[in-house]
Regions:
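Non-catalytic accessory segments flanking enzymatic or RNA/DNA-binding domains
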Residues: 1-292
Length: 292
């Protein structure tokens, strides 16, 4: 059976996927999880998830398959972190690696990410990553604001736009979770709000709004319906039929209801991937409509 570690999860243009590393065999397997029924059981032991190549966007396993000590904050060991060489707040000092210097000199975009009418975030990413960065964050709609020749030029725009009242530079996962489980999203409404913000607040010309929901779930009714927060969330199991994933929140259907369960804290942990088994049952308050 071997020891398996969840080394990555994300939503691509082909939907939600996870990567499982077999630590004994030294192999990594990608799994498309939408439409699959499973339970992921998390164990306390943690291992390095490996390095990421900023230029090719490729991930590689940690050669030593390094175990991570208790209380260690990162998901990569120091050697793999050095190999990656990424410092997201490069503009605050702290040194820039050769890898990051090369990456910073590639074209970057400034984007507006929409989470709710009151939660608009401005950020930057390399033009090569573009939409994938938006999907990683779980934005529901988005708009590209500027195309710049480098990260430095993009960062100047980001700093300027983020100083605007009511515009976020970052959003906590707990806020994203609350919005996902309490707010309904309408792309037409989001588009109108983004256009107005870009034109009136930023003084820029709006570009075409991007609808991101179609990547999170193939079934439109999933995100159009209610996403529930379980009354009894588990910190060690995510279970059910996976009907999509928004950012790092897996959408798991049980007994006809869809629950959001965060997988972010499972990354770097040893896990059991129990295919076809539902080993944990979520519960939630009755639907409002059923009270009458």
């Amino acid at each position: 059976l071997g020891r398996h570690m969840l080394s990555w999860l994300g939503v691509g243009f082909d939907g939600p996927r996870i990567a499982l590393d077999d630590l004994d065999e030294g192999t990594r397997t990608m799994h498309s999880i939408e439409g699959e029924t499973f339970t992921i059981v998390k164990h306390p032991e943690r291992f390095c998830v490996g390095a990421y190549n900023l230029m090719t966007q490729e991930r590689e396993m940690c050669e030593r398959r390094q175990e991570l000590p208790d209380g260690y904050k990162e998901t990569s060991c120091p050697a793999c972190a050095d190999k990656t060489g990424f410092n997201p707040s490069f503009y605050n000092g702290g040194g820039i690696s050769a890898q990051q210097r090369a990456y910073n000199d590639t074209p970057h975009i400034v984007y507006l990410a929409y989470f709710s009418p009151r939660h608009l975030k401005v950020g930057i990413t390399s033009a090569a990553r573009g939409k994938l960065r938006l999907l990683e964050q779980g934005a529901r709609s988005a708009m590209i604001l500027k195309e710049c020749e480098s990260a430095y030029a993009a960062r100047e725009w980001e700093a300027k736009l983020c100083s605007t009242q009511g515009i976020y530079e970052s959003l906590l996962p707990s806020v994203k979770y609350r919005l996902l489980t309490t707010q309904t999203h309408d792309h037409a409404e989001a588009s109108a709000i983004m256009r107005k913000t870009v034109r009136d607040t930023f003084g820029l010309e709006p570009t075409d709004p991007i609808d991101l929901d179609r990547y999170y779930s193939r079934d439109e009714s999933v995100l159009a319906g209610s996403i529930n927060e379980p009354d009894n969330p588990s910190s060690t199991m995510v279970a059910g039929e996976c009907v999509g994933m928004v950012g790092t929140f897996a959408l798991m259907r049980q007994q006809g209801r869809v629950y959001a369960a965060s997988l972010k804290d499972y990354v770097s942990h040893l896990v059991d991937y129990r295919f076809g088994e539902v080993l944990y049952e979520y519960s939630a308050p009755p639907e409002q409509g059923s009270l009458f």
